[in-house]
Amino acid sequence: MYKLAAIVGPTAVGKTNISLEVARQINGEIISCDSMQLYRGMNIGTAKASKEEQNIVAHHLIDIADPHENFTVARYQSLVKDLISTINARGKIPILVGGTGLYYQSVVDDYTFFPMEVRQSIRDKWNAIIQEKGLPHVYRLLEQIDPAYAQIISPNDQKRVVRALEVYELTGKAFSTLQDRAENTYYLAVVGLYLERRELYARIERRVDEMIKKGLIEEVAALREKGIDLSYNSMQALGYKQVFYFLEGFINREELLNEIKRETRRYAKRQLTWFKKDQRIKWFNVGDFSDEELLVKNICTFMEGQFGIV
C-alpha cells in the first residue's frame, strides 16, 4: 500500500509554512488540496506558496488550469491518485496540503464518480426545481435527507446543495455517510491544524489586509479584462467574488474589506466543522507550541510513527 500524509485545517492557520518544513524533514512532496490554487493567475487571493517556496520542496497541482475551466473534483482525484503512486515510487511521501474538504475526502475515502451524462440529467432536474420553487425549498429537502451535510454548507450554496441531492439519487445514501474508507488503499497520516477562534480570526483580518496591499484588486481586474466573470467556478473563490462586486461599483472599499473578512471567517468555521468529523485526523493547536520548530517536530514524530519510519 502507498503512504499518504495530509495537513489540513482552516484558512490562515499556517498550513503552508508548516507543510514546507514537514515535507523537507520527512522527504515529502506537497500536493495542493485547494480547489482554487489550481487556477493560473489567481495567486494573491488563494495564498499560493511562492515560487521560492515551491523551489524548496516539490509542489503539485498548482497553476494547472485556466480560470475559465470548470475543474471538477473527479478530475482532481484522478490526478492525485497518479501523483500518489509516482511520488511513492520515487521513495518519497506525498503530502496533501489544504483546506478544501471535498477534495481531501475524495482522495482519502476513494469516492466513486458516476458518468457525467447521468449526473448531468439529475443535476438539471434539481436546478429546474430550484428555478421553479426556489433554493430554500430544495435546501429544506436536503435537510431532511442529509441533515449532517446541510449543517456544514451554506443554504445559498446551490452547487453543493444540488451535488448532495445528486449523490443521494445515485447511491441511495446521504453524502455525509459515504465513508468508504481508504485504509485498504493507503497508509494514512493526517494532521489537522487549528487555533483558538480569536487568534484565527485575527490572522484572517491581517491576511485580508495584506492581500489587498499586495494587489488582490488589481489581480481580479486583470482577470476581468480577460473576460473572466462570476459565471466561472474560479470566481467563486473567497475574495474574488467580492472584488468583482467592488469593481462593478456595487460596494465601496470599506464594504469590500468587511465582506471578505466576514465570508472568510464563515468559511473557516465550515472548514473546521467538515474536518472535525474525520476521526483519523490528529489535531494540533498551533497556539500550544512556543515556536514553529517544535510544532513541526511533533508533527513529524506523529507521521513517522504512523508510517513506521525509524
UniProtKB/Swiss-Prot annotation:
Q: So where does substrate get bound? A: 11-16
GO terms, molecular function = ATP binding; tRNA dimethylallyltransferase activity
Q: Which cofactors does it use?
A: Mg(2+)
Q: Which sites bind ATP?
A: 9-16
Q: Which reaction is the catalytic activity of this chain?
A: adenosine(37) in tRNA + dimethylallyl diphosphate = N(6)-dimethylallyladenosine(37) in tRNA + diphosphate
Ranges for region Interaction with substrate tRNA: 34-37
Protein name according to UniProt: tRNA dimethylallyltransferase
Q: Which organism is it from?
A: Syntrophomonas wolfei subsp. wolfei (strain DSM 2245B / Goettingen)
